[in-house]
Amino acid sequence: MELLFSNLAHGFGVALSLDNLLFALLGALIGTAIGVLPGIGPVATISLLLPITFGQPATTAIIMLAGIYYGAQYGGSTTAILLNLPGEVSSVVTTLEGYKMARNGRAGAALTIAACGSFFAGTVATLVVAASGPLLTQVALSFGPADYFSLMLLGLIISAVLAQGSILKSIAMVVLGVALGLVGTDVQTGQQRFTFGVPELSDGLGFVSIAMGIFGIGEIILNLERPEARSVLSGKVGSLWLTREEFRRSIPSVLRGTLVGSVLGILPGGGASLSAFGSYMMERKISKYRHEFGSGAIEGVAGPEAANNAAAQTSFIPLLTLGIPANAVMALMVGALIIQGIQPGPRMVEAQPDLFWGLICSMWVGNLMLLVINLPMIGMWVKLLQVPYKFLYPAILVFCAIGVYSLNNSVFDVYQTLFFGILGYIFSKLRMEAAPLLIGFVLGPMMEEHLRRAMLLSRGDVAVFIERPISATLLAVAAVTLGAMLLPGLRAGKDKALAE
């Protein structure tokens, strides 16, 4: 415990430096803004902002990107409550009860419990990350190459299973992502793979080009098809203070939502969205006020908002301890770290203590900033909703082109980004979720490296994957998970749950 407090003190020393404070505030503000604006989201925003992080210290850059992620969870609740339109996917559930509360004259109370519940959950989840991170790191150090390969394979399967839509489409996206990760020159043999004679592909496909294209430009093209009509709730927001009854009813929901989010956020493919849905389903089943659900039950706002913010924090656990992304945002974080020359994984605690503990402590600082700035600035966020998308999207596209060109001063990178933007749009029209592709792209080369190491150490004996207990257990879990979801009954149940 003494060591934990010592590490946290070191982390706060890093997080409270002027540069890191400013970038944490910048990330929180950008995150809130893109959370408020429907149709953009943290994945697209982080992918668009990756180029500007190259000139920054690694700790400062990751602190800003993390602030965008959990800031979007705060901002998404504003549009969900005031417009009945989720600014972020994880806020879809908040529309069910939050907008009803607003129609009943309790918009202020809904916004307050969303912000306060998110802050409490973020604080608890930050402590969970701080306490569990070093412990899991010690466990991860005992992993061999075969264990890592099996763990990454399990992560890919879970990300496919938890993705929305057809399980076969999700698996296809994972396979495509792994294949894209293999493009370029094989570092072991020097042979070029899947380059088709294009010299620019000898170094592989650009991570920024794929992320920015699929999640940035692809989303912009898709949003241009949607009607722009947005009507903000007429009338005043009302008092921000909760009544004594609302406060009493909210506390258990916030506690349960925090627990659900802290656990589900760690799962590959889980994250904030799954946690929010899980929390809402739980509240609807166990609440004493079930009859109010659908007409403005405060539990339906408190629980999911706590859950999605807790999950946003704990999704960093597998990234920081194992180097494995739990969702698309964490895959972008892996890319940002690798671009900075840092290999995420169990050795980060010792090799990059400023980054590891500074990031953890900045999460709490960022959550405090969000609590302080969000409620007083509700009027400004509502004004932001009035910005026409016909002005917003062209500016984003120009920013994309400049950012991706500045990486290598290469026009080919711009063309590559546009190609993946069109591909991302096609994926959306075919209802093929792109997150498993990005996770596969990040994990594919890592899996290949660990596979080769395992085969070298075992002198080509594939039995090493089932002889090591950890590897065998992970492979068994992966096989059972995939086999279960291929059963028609369970697949239908999953689709029904996601639809609800």
Model-derived regions, located:
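Flexible loop linkers connecting adjacent transmembrane helices
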Residues: 48, 81-109, 135, 139, ...
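Transmembrane alpha-helix interface/packing and boundary motifs in multi-pass membrane proteins
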Residues: 28-42, 72-84, 159-164, 258-268, ...
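Re-entrant/interfacial helical elements at transmembrane boundaries that shape
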Residues: 42-51, 65, 80-100, 131, ...
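A structural-propensity feature for long, helix-poor, extended segments
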Residues: 69-81, 87, 297-322, 326, ...
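Membrane-interface alpha-helices at helix entry/exit sites of multi-pass transporters
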Residues: 59-63, 100-117, 288-301, 328-331, ...
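Short helix-coil transition sites and intra-membrane helix breaks within transmembrane domains
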Residues: 34-43, 81-92, 124-128, 264-274, ...
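Membrane-embedded alpha-helical modules
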Residues: 112-228, 339-493
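Helix-loop-helix hairpins and the membrane-proximal interhelical loops
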Residues: 1-61, 134, 138-141, 192-297, ...
